[in-house]
Curated annotation (Swiss-Prot):
This is UPF0280 protein MMP1236. NCBIfam families: PRK04334.1-1. InterPro entries: ApbE-like_sf, MA1715-like, UPF0280. It comes from Methanococcus maripaludis (strain DSM 14266 / JCM 13030 / NBRC 101832 / S2 / LL). Belongs to the UPF0280 family. It comes from the Archaea. SUPFAM superfamilies: ApbE-like.
């Protein structure tokens, strides 16, 4: 299976997109442009949507992207912008599926939505943790039939806001939007020594609906809750976005 890859950067949105046909790159760019316009225009009129760390009510006539992000915020008890990266990955894949794309992976700063017709391994990137680059999650093709979300939050890697210090909180869900907000929310509980922090994260994860499972990595320690894909050894020291294998 041959994949075509392109990095798409439009303002703050930086997507690594892999597709089975290069014609889908233009569609993805149009999706980003249109949805960014909806988001930016709404924020101009409602700046609290951008700055709030708590869930924000939005009207029924708000753009779909706004309602999706707000829903994810309420589901995980965080501000709607906690879901922004996963939202763009999700909307890109949904649009490509509607246009008969069979295989596509959209990665936006560690927040992934993918649809593949064969089993796929996604690598774990967890900063300086010894587990980083050595573990991957093997997803079955049946799980990705309508798109699937794998989103990671970190208190030690990247520029996203996290109140905790876990190396990685990876959340699995049918929705990358829900998964992104959940990862941020769970990551905020990663405080204290590694074992205690991981337990706090897993306890928080139990309170969040619409997610399949969570994998938490902190230093030499890790924990999981719920149903996560099969863990496999990868032996690859690469950033998460570059570790995709069709198996």
């Amino acid at each position: 299976m041959k994949f075509f890859q392109e990095k798409i950067s439009i303002k703050e949105t930086n997507i690594l997109l892999k597709v089975d046909n290069p014609k889908f790159f233009k569609m993805a760019k149009n999706t980003i442009i249109n949805e960014r316009l909806n988001l930016e225009n709404y924020i101009l009129r409602n700046p609290i949507f951008l700055t709030s760390y708590s869930p924000v009510e939005v009207p029924d006539n708000a753009p779909e992207i706004i309602k999706l992000m707000a829903e994810a915020g309420f589901n995980a008890d965080v501000g709607p912008m906690a879901a922004v990266a996963g939202t763009f990955s999700q909307l890109i894949i949904e649009n490509l599926i509607e246009n008969d794309c069979k295989n596509a992976i959209s990665e936006n700063g560690g927040d992934i939505c993918l649809k593949c017709e064969m089993d796929t391994t996604v690598g774990l990137y967890a900063g300086n943790s010894s587990l980083s680059g050595n573990l991957g999650f093997k997803l079955k093709k049946e799980k990705m039939k309508n798109g699937y979300g794998i989103c990671t939050s970190s208190g030690t890697v990247g520029h996203s806001v996290s109140l905790g210090n876990a190396d990685s909180i990876t959340v699995f869900s049918k929705s990358a939007i829900i998964a992104d907000a959940a990862a941020t929310s769970i990551g905020n509980f990663a405080v204290g020594n590694a074992v205690d922090a991981i337990n706090k994260c897993l306890e928080k994860a139990e309170t969040i609906s619409k997610i399949d499972g969570v994998f938490v990595c902190m230093g030499e320690h890790a924990g999981k809750i719920g149903k996560i894909p099969q863990l496999i050894k990868t032996d690859k020291k690469e950033v998460l976005g570059n570790v995709f294998e069709m198996v």
